[in-house]
Amino acid sequence: MSNIKNISAENCYSTIKENKDAYLVDVRTPYEWETFGRVDKDSFDAQYIELTLIDEEGDENTNFLDQFNSYGILKNSEIYFICKSGARSMHAALILESNGYQNLYNVEDGFVIGWKPSGLPSK
C-alpha cells in the first residue's frame, strides 16, 4: 500500500509557500517548461528542482533516481511532485517511495490542469 498523498495544486502551493525545508520537483520535459511555462520558484520558500522523468520521445530517464539522489535530499523530507496532469509525478513519487523516501506528495491536477488555471504563480 502506497503512502503517497495526492494534493491539489492550490493546497501544494499554500503548503510550500513558507516551507523552506520542502521540495517541489517538476518532472516535465524541457519542451513542456518552455511551451506551457514553469512554476514561479521565487514565489515560495521550498526548494525547486526540474528533473525530467520521461523525455519527449516517451523514454524513461533511467538515471532519474541517481540524479535525484545527487541533490542530497533527506529521505524524510517533504517532497512534492508535479507534471502536466498528475500521472508522471505519481510515477516519480512511487520510484522514490520504493527507495525509502517517506513524505511524498503528488500534485494530482498537475501544472496545466491545476497550477496554471488556478492562477498560481508561474512564468
Model-derived regions: residue spans:
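Rhodanese-like catalytic fold shared by cysteine-dependent sulfurtransferases
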Residues: 2-23, 30-78, 87-123
